[in-house]
Amino acid sequence: SEMFIVRQKYLNQLEDNYYRGGNGNLGQGSLSHTWKNAFNQVGIVPEEVYHGINYNSEKHNHGEMVRYINALGNTAVKMKRRSPEYYKLINNLFDTYLGELPEKFTYKGKEYTPKSFAESLGLNMDDYIELTSFTHKPYYQKFSPEVPDNWENEQMYNLPLDEMMEVADYALTHGYTVCWDGDVSEKGFSFKNGVATVSYTHLRAHETE
């Protein structure tokens, strides 16, 4: 369930924003490690158990919910406290838009909790690494990309672009999973066509800056 993770992601963002005095990121974007961190915290459930649409829409639309998240989160910052009522409001907000969280559920004839279901999948988040390719930092070293979606300040291993693509191709051809993070707000991304493009001229221009 994507939205099971998204709910925990927003809770983590709210906490981060509070301790940053309102200077955190309460937007909808994040990176792959956000999923891993939430998975380790709360586990996971199947999509059929928690589809995350508890409002009148066929598709996910968090525009209204995010406005309320910002209002509640920034109110706590201004008041410099998070009261018991604050936590109730936050959880009620997510229950209203995403649905109530399941404590237990039955899947394919077996009963699970979110944590026990995660354990049954045999996934170790420590087995996954994050790679990136930026020209303003040294290659073959880790650094924390300075982008808003990296609000958790996680580090990634920086590779030349061609080598990063070689690693991705090798992983896929040998049966491993690759999760690709991209900026869907860029002009080259098309939801309609399901593709993302970067012009060769644009790419080389950035490499020579």
Predicted regions and their residues:
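Structured alpha-helical subdomains that flank or immediately precede key functional sites
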Residues: 1-200
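Conserved small/polar residues in nucleotide/adenosyl-binding loops
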Residues: 201-208
